[in-house]
Amino acid sequence: MSLSVAGIEVDPAIIPPLDPSFLPASLFNREYHKLVSAVGSVPLRLALEGSDGSISEFRTSVVPPAAGHLQATLLLIERTVKFLLWQRGGWKLYVGGPAEVGEHIKSVYSPTGARKFDFAFMSSVYEHPFEVVVTSAEAVPPSKENTMPLGRHLDGCRVGFDLGASDRKASAVINGEAVFSEEIVWDPRNASDPDYHYQGVMDSIRRAAAHLPRLDAVGGSAAGVYINNRARVASLYRAVPPKLFAEKIAPLFLRIRDELGVPMEVVNDGEVTALAGSMSLGGNPVLGLALGSSLASGYVNRDGNITGWLNELAFAPVDYRMNGPLDEWSGDCCGSQFFSQQAVNRVAVSAGMQFPEKLGLPERLVLIQKKMEEGDALVAKLYETIGTYVGYGVAYYADFYDLKHVLILGRVTTGPGGEIILNKSIEVLRKEFPEIASTVSIALPDEKSRRVGQSIAAASLPAIKEIPR
């Protein structure tokens, strides 16, 4: 079955059984670069500058505009820019190459352009108006990356928590061993009162701390962008009015730290996903993909350090079809619609599965998982569809990350459906991208680690200066 966009035709070897129009970004890019090899190329360089002065550069080649295929080139680079923004982040984008490409990107990523959400988000996170600099390839600044160690502190009595859109997890950990773990359902995205968020987090911490002889430190992970323990932007708090967000939510974890009187660190949930993977695998680099309410993603490099990148792959594209599934914030064909409970629900509904109207996504997933345990053939195809997404998605991520280990976890991978996702993703890599399959492994953690490993890894985030004796 051939699929076409912007004059580029792709022929996937494996079709998602319940989403046959899925057009993998990895296949589009491969076919485009075959075209580059056939008709000639010019260099194109992109670089993103962060608030700390770090520079992250990305190099590729495109067909010269005079040789045609401009529509495909513009699509490729616009999608690449969007991916890099959500992978690496930054307030200034350098586009070095053909002027037609640079000016197109500048118009799209503007306050009134098609990517105005991305423009506004980056401006907010980095507290500086987003800027696009159109220049030559030679004038693009080289990479100057900053990395830092993260967590791995296993001493003492700790609480770790993980805040998701549908549940909050917490673990009590003594010298690296979990002595208590639990999950509590909550609904933060519809809670406009900051006190709901405060009380929920404190409840999880206190319930876990009750299983410890003392509390030495607290570590947390949560969806969104957190800098120095302050919330910058996060979908968990989307219902909180901006004024209250600035007054109550931004300093929320600083308040909790001061009230508890112990060291506390809170970071993006994706970074802890990668940390959990690195700790369980004992190897690096690791890309962690947590398929939960949305997609949480994080990356640990070959040195075992985080990079300072955003790694918000929920908002990064993986599908190049026109009029594909929409993320309510970031637009078309992003990771949140392919690697999450949202994806499961989208595919299930499109396949004709019916649910009680008022049933939430977490409860729908539970019903789907129960049907999978009963051997439902349609549900098996649903999981094969998600697994196909994962396989082609990992191949695309390999264009942007140095990969060795990819760990998939989260509520969507719970139960026998998780094994189907894993096996199908490996099948896609072996059949379509054998060169990647030979060097990159995709794995699931064990069932217990899969559900609560995030909060246990989060507990290791803070260093304890002195352990009480």
Predicted regions and their residues:
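Phosphate-binding/catalytic loop of phosphoryl-transfer enzymes
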Residues: 153, 219, 228-333, 455-469
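ATP-binding/phosphotransfer module of carbohydrate and carboxylate kinases, centering on a glycine-rich
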Residues: 1-185, 190-216, 262, 280, ...
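Short, active-site-adjacent cap segments at secondary-structure transitions
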Residues: 100-103, 224-229, 272-274, 296-297, ...
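Short, flexible micro-motifs
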Residues: 167-168, 222-227, 291, 295-299, ...
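Short acidic/His/Gly/Ser-rich catalytic and metal-binding motifs that mark active-site loops
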Residues: 179-182, 226-232
